[in-house]
């Protein structure tokens, strides 16, 4: 199975995909997230990962033992929600445990810890998304190395889905907007402060304002401090998103589809005029696609 790891400023998201088979799209079997902490060692992250894999019924390391593979097959089908009778799985179809990995990060100090984790505990040399990685997407930025890996990964996944011009809105620590041309080129985008950063700024900078949970208020017109802050944050960010997307649409000479991802995509996307689809697993899907392209690249060399 493939372990995809998206290391963000706030959270690290893990996705487990079934082993890739020619002609089939591997399913995302399960996923989980932990808080990003720069000071954690590879041993600490390994302990957390091993525990979470166990809770999700995924063995930690790969095996080619037929009995173990059959047991892993049962776990895979259970994770996928299948109720059909279990059939023996071939060694080629599923390895027991994690047999491949791919990493992407916007937090360089954490990258080295995860590389050591993969090599020491999983005995895998993971693909690291960065300059030189075969994404299959030309980058039309002034300096392509300045574009965050997560933004390119999202763009790859969105273009693979639509095969047309598209805009990706990612609600992370920062809110990013990324435009892809109908030819599958990364055109550029915009970066705004994330809604969480704005909420924290209100709490820290205004002495009488409390910290509030990010929820959709009943009304735009708040009747108390908490609902007023929630209205300003939620609807203010919906307005920000719609405003930037509409300006981007007016600036390009091709139609675009708009997809949102990130932990708050569904909360904010439901009130947006411009967001057409929300997919919280878009980045994990992009990692899986790039891993497959790297595999094909390796087979040709």
Outline where the language-model segments fall.
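ATP-binding/phosphotransfer module of carbohydrate and carboxylate kinases, centering on a glycine-rich
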Residues: 1-4, 36, 40, 70-73, ...
